């Protein structure tokens, strides 16, 4: 039985009193059956759901703004570390091929985001895409995990800014931080610089999206200039012999010292350097011409970043033999050990500092817009959905998440934070690719979704089997046979689906090519990368996933049910997925 009471505005509320709320909890099963897999429609997301925010975001961004935001979001300080680590441990000089492969895969995954963003130009990004496809709870589960990943990552990035700033000025990090006795290790180093950076960026993104884009453009231009400078210095000082000859003759030699396995292991490691383009899709509501600007902005930024990464990889591989590369600070260490070139180390620190600021700005823009649209769905308080009438930005969401990020950055050690990021982002990429296939092959209305759902499940299982074989089975002929067999099965599954199940709809404006192969590659890649993450990542994912489920059970499902009863959601729309499953 649904238990509701009137709120002050004449609507229904499950939270008007403790008694009403406790009675509402008894209706949780029936509300779950109605709301958990209820889908919204594109027209509702563009009209009634957007209206929850009151004011509208201004459409002021063009394709070049999106390219700048995409580059700024992807090219952070991490590339200065990831390149050396992947080259030293996995790929050797062939790290440039690893970056090219990872860039191609990132582009395929970005295509999935682009089709949704063109069709549904709202600020919700992946949350909105999954909500119109799989329903409310899957959208909240993935979106909330992504927001937590954003917050953790931004806190980690802001603390690393202190370290790179110290490198640029030749000052030890300990001079910028102070230790508080009595606090547990990992939480006792206070970093006021990180807090200041987060709060300043929070103020910037609250003031104006257009001005934020201009600030990002300026900092990104400086960052790219520093990167090109380091690349040129690497080519000048480097030696092409290092592309094939290790320092130790006993180590594997050649351009591919670790073979194909090393190239793909390297690609898996450096793929995380491309994370950031998804934040561009959250800006869709503020783009002047989404049909034209979003495909150019997203694809263009990924392509440019791929070229930059490949040039950096070649430059670094020429600087030193791969077995002498410092996996923690490859460029800085290479120049620091050369007479007369130590000053380049400070240039690297300055460039990395700009990269941190741009990636932090873009990520904080993205996390606020995710939170804003989650608030529009009412599964979190719709206070987060409010748009400021003067700035046309989600000030409430930006301020709340900015303060939360600053609090984490103040106390929490970088290594603690880094163990908590990445899995949510990869999981969202995986869900968006699945959602795109489902949306293309399952029409809205009474129909049978099971062939598509079975295909997605079988392909995911096969991809997981391939990943486990790659990670766990020792090298040898049995491993090669098992990998080949699982690959053949995966290809056969896709071919069978393509032949048996016709596309139910084709996009009118912009669509992903080579369906369903393109999103399938994205699904496989994200499962493969999820399999490469360490145990603490899954502990974090399980912990926060449990919290998210509890929030939905004790708040979200009741708040969205109230919104439906008050007319914020269409009853017909809320029944679409339920009707699909009942067929």
Swiss-Prot record:
One GO term of the biological process aspect: response to nematode
InterPro entries to which the protein is assigned, alphabetical: AA/rel_permease1, CAT_C
Localization of this protein: Plastid, Chloroplast membrane
Pfam families: AA_permease_2, AA_permease_C
The organelle targeting sequence, given as a residue range: 1-50
UniProt tissue specificity: Expressed in roots, stems, flowers, and leaves.
Membrane topology term: Multi-pass membrane protein
One cellular component (GO) term of this entry: plasma membrane
Annotated keywords: Amino-acid transport, Chloroplast, Membrane, Plastid, Transit peptide, Transmembrane, Transmembrane helix, Transport
Coiled-coil region(s): none
Record family assignment: Belongs to the amino acid-polyamine-organocation (APC) superfamily. Cationic amino acid transporter (CAT) (TC 2.A.3.3) family.
PANTHER family per UniProt: CATIONIC AMINO ACID TRANSPORTER 6, CHLOROPLASTIC (PTHR43243:SF69), INNER MEMBRANE TRANSPORTER YGJI-RELATED (PTHR43243)
Descriptive protein name: Cationic amino acid transporter 6, chloroplastic
């Amino acid at each position: 039985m649904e238990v509701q009471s009137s709120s002050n505005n004449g609507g229904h509320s499950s939270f008007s009193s403790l008694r009403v709320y406790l009675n509402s909890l008894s209706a949780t099963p029936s509300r779950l059956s109605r709301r958990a897999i209820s889908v919204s429609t594109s027209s509702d997301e563009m009209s009634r759901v957007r209206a929850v925010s009151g004011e509208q975001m201004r459409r002021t961004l063009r394709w070049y703004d999106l390219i700048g935001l995409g580059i700024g979001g992807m090219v952070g300080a991490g590339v200065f570390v990831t390149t050396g680590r992947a080259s030293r441990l996995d790929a050797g000089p062939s790290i440039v091929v690893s970056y090219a492969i990872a860039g191609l895969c990132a582009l395929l995954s970005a295509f999935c985001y682009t089709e949704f963003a063109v069709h549904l130009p709202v600020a919700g990004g992946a949350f909105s895409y999954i909500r119109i496809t799989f329903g409310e709870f899957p959208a909240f589960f993935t979106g909330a995990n992504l927001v937590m990943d954003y917050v953790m990552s931004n806190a980690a990035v802001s603390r690393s800014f202190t370290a790179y700033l110290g490198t640029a000025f030749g000052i030890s990090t300990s001079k910028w931080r102070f230790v508080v006795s009595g606090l547990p290790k990992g939480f006792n180093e206070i970093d006021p610089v990180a807090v200041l950076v987060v709060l300043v960026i929070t103020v910037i993104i609250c003031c104006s999206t257009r001005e934020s884009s201009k600030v990002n453009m300026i900092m990104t231009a400086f960052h790219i200039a520093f990167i090109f400078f380091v690349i040129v210095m690497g080519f000048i000082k480097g030696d092409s012999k290092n592309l094939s000859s290790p320092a130790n003759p006993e180590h594997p030699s050649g351009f591919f010292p670790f073979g194909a396995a090393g190239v793909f292991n390297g690609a898996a490691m450096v793929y995380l350097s491309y994370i950031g383009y998804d934040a561009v899709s959250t800006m869709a509501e503020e783009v002047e011409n989404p049909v034209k600007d979003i495909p150019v902005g997203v694809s263009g930024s990924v392509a440019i970043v791929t070229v930059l990464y490949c040039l950096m990889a070649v430059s670094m591989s020429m600087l030193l033999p791969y077995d002498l590369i410092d996996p923690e600070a490859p460029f800085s260490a290479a120049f620091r050990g050369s007479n007369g070139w130590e000053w380049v180390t400070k240039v690297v620190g300055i460039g990395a500092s700009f990269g941190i600021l741009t990636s932090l700005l873009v990520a904080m823009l993205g996390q606020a817009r995710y939170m804003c649209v989650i608030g529009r769905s009412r599964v979190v308080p719709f206070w987060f959905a409010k748009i400021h009438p003067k700035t046309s930005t989600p000030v409430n969401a930006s301020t709340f998440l900015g303060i939360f990020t600053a609090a984490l950055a103040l106390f929490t050690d970088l290594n603690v934070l880094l163990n908590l990021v990445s899995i949510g982002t990869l999981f969202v990429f995986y869900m968006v690719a699945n959602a795109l296939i489902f949306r293309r092959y399952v029409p809205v209305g009474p129909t049978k979704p099971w062939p598509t759902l079975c295909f997605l499940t079988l392909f995911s299982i096969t991809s997981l089997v391939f990943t486990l074989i790659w990670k766990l089975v020792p090298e040898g002929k049995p491993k090669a046979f098992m990998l080949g067999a699982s690959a053949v099965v995966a290809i056969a599954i896709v071919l069978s689906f393509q032949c048996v199940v016709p596309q139910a709809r084709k996009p009118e404006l912009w669509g992903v090519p080579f369906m369903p192969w393109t999103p399938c590659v994205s699904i496989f890649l994200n499962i493969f990368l999820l399999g490469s993450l360490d145990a603490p990542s899954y502990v974090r994912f399980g912990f926060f996933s449990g919290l998210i489920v509890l929030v939905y059970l004790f708040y979200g499902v009741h708040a969205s049910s109230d919104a439906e009863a008050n007319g914020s959601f269409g009853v017909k729309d809320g029944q679409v997925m339920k009707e699909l499953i009942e067929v």
